[in-house]
Each structure stands twice: as C-alpha cells, then as structure tokens.
C-alpha cells in the first residue's frame, strides 16, 4: 500500500511563513456574519479590519488570523434554535480561507460552558450549569458532560471550547462567576473540572481552563470594571489547585482572568 507522507512539523510550517503571517497567528478575534462570504455586516467588519474587508473570510485572509471566536451578537448564529448546518458551513468556509492563505488550520472557538454561558442553544444539549454539577460530586458525570460538549462543538467545526470554569467560588457576592463555578472546594473543582477537560478533549476539541489565576473571589464584574483581589498567598494557592491539576492533566489551553491580584 502507498505510504502517506507525514504532516509538516510546526517548524517546517513556520519556516514558510512571512512575518505578517506569524504575527497573525497570535490574533484571535470575532468576525461578523453567518457565512464566510456574508456581506450583510460589511460595515461592522470594516470598522474592525479596515476598508476592503467586508466578509469573515476576507478578515481571515488579510490578517492571517490564528483564530476566531463565535458570538450570537456578531450574527454568527442565533442562540435560540441554532441552525447547526449553517454554523458548520461557516466553520468550513473560514477553514478554507485559512488554508488558501497559508495552509495553517484556523482555531475556531466559543464559550460553551453549559448553564448560563452557552452560546449555542437548542438543538445543542442544555446543561444546568457547573454549580449543579458540583452538587453531584460525580466525576463520571462531569466527564460525560465534557464529552457531549466536545462532540457537539466538533460537529459545528469548532475545535476549541473556552470551558470549563475552574474558579473556586469563595465570594458569595461574586457577580460574574456564581453559578458558573463548580464549588468553593478547590479539590472538588479540580476533580470535576479535570474530568470535564478530559471529556471535552476526548472528542478532539481543545478545552480551556479559566480564569487563571482564579476569578472566584472577585466582587466586580470584569466585563464592566477591573476587579482587584487582595487575598493572601495562602488563599491564592487554594485558587491555583484546579489549574495545577488541569496542567498536569494535559489541558490544551488556559485563559487568564481580567483581574488585578
């Protein structure tokens, strides 16, 4: 039988890229439109990317983007009764644009945590959220939830999920984490969060441990202001427990928090 040639190594790919392409790989952003060639939101895309960039595909090509992040407010899809076929077609179109530009696969990401932060709605599976998962204390259930999240996102052409939340929920007045957190027990967060990560990544989708080094003690919504956490090093070490477990378990990505520690 014919022997298939080995894929190029990262070093071989980098050797063929110019400086602009290398810089572009560091950029992950949103694009407007529900298809790669959608011109409906040309003015929105031009406001971000400049003249001549009217479609999502043009943005990927011009700036050699490393990744895109899907949002319903960017008109990539509707969060209610999501047309999954169109989302998959959008992903395929953007990957084709990336391949034509430099043959480097595009990172396509989303915040699909389950619970209150679930960008894709029905027919995707709707989960009750991490606090409910934490109440079960069941690692097998956490792994299964991760599997479902990974499987469904992969079917949409999404290859990285900005989940799970590994914040230790030590502040009951936290306005932005709350139900998104598994528990106020760092060891339980580590166990169930680690299981979620393994479940997501078992489906060929990268999981993301967030929000490093821990957003669970904040009292400000980081989307509206800059939270400051002033706990001791001993307390910080407790917030780091789930992230250490995730790193040792081989999590693909880590998202930093918008906080001052």
Language-model regions, residue ranges each:
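Alpha-helical scaffolding within the catalytic cores
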Residues: 9-14, 51-57, 237-244
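Histidine-centered catalytic micro-motifs
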Residues: 209, 241, 256
């Amino acid at each position: 039988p014919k022997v298939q040639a080995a894929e190029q190594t990262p070093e071989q790919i980098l050797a063929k890229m110019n400086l602009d392409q290398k810089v572009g790989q560091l950029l992950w952003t949103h694009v407007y439109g529900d298809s790669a060639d959608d011109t409906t939101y040309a003015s929105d895309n031009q406001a971000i990317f400049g003249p001549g960039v009217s479609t999502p595909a043009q943005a990927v090509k011009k700036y050699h983007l490393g990744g895109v992040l899907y949002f319903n407010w960017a008109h990539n899809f509707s969060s209610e009764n999501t047309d999954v076929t169109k989302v998959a077609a959008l992903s395929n179109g953007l990957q084709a644009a990336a391949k034509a530009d430099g043959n480097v696969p595009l990172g396509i990401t989303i915040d699909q945590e389950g619970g209150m932060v679930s960008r894709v709605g029905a027919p995707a599976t709707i989960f009750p959220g991490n606090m409910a998962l934490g109440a079960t204390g069941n690692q097998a259930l956490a792994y299964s939830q991760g599997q479902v999240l990974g499987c469904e996102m992969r079917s949409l052409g999404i290859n990285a999920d900005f989940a799970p939340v590994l914040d230790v929920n030590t502040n009951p007045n936290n306005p932005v984490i709350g139900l998104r957190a598994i528990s106020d027990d760092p060891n339980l967060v580590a166990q169930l969060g680690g299981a979620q990560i393994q479940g997501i990544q078992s489906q060929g989708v990268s999981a993301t441990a967030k929000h490093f080094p821990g957003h669970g003690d904040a009292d400000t919504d980081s989307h509206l202001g800059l939270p400051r956490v002033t706990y001791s090093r001993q307390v910080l070490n407790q917030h780091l427990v789930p992230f250490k477990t995730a790193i040792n378990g081989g999590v693909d990505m880590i998202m930093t928090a918008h906080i001052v520690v």
